[in-house]
Amino acid sequence: MSMAGAERPVSSAAGLPVRWALAVVLGLLAIQATVLFAMGRVPICTCGTVKLWHGVVMSSENSQHLTDWYTFSHIIHGFLFYAGTWLLLRRWPWTARLIVAVLIEGAWELTENSSFIIERYRAGTISLDYYGDSIVNSVADTLAMISGFLLARWLPVTATVAIAVLFEVLVGLHIRDNLTLNVIMLIHPFDAIRQWQAGPPII
């Protein structure tokens, strides 16, 4: 997003060194995976395979592989977390703000995979076959957020916004769901949206 245009790879003199931040991020990912396992989430898809991409939303394998249509939403999370931490924690080095973003994303992944939220998704959205993410999918979602955060750090604001809008429109038209609709339907399900989401892909 290049709002902090002077930001470049940091050294210890500029704040939190990249290697330390990387160690913290890897530790947080390990904690996320461990807690998810303790919550009863399966390590990989129960189908026994790990796919790089799974594009069938209405399937028991959705949110079980490395990437899917919802990966784009997690990239947008990274855009938003970069913008938010830049606004609120502007004096912090970008490496420290990345750790904050990973903490937020990890907390959401744990919340999303709680029994309450899983049932909320199943009752209020099109995710009737959703029984929680596999651990590999959840960790991959956090990595997608990290990629979005890093992209936002380097891209101009206009490019970042354009990419986010493009993702939302194209994904929304293809699977009739996206980050915006997901949040709306999680907070307050609307029958009109649910009925619209039941239709076939528009593109």
UniProtKB/Swiss-Prot annotation:
Pfam families named among the record's database cross-references: DUF2585
Name used for this protein in its record: UPF0314 protein RPA0307
Keyword set includes Repeat: no
Membrane topology annotation: Multi-pass membrane protein
Family, per entry: Belongs to the UPF0314 family.
Keywords: Cell membrane, Membrane, Transmembrane, Transmembrane helix
Residues passing through the membrane, by range: 20-40, 69-89, 155-175
Subcellular location field: Cell membrane
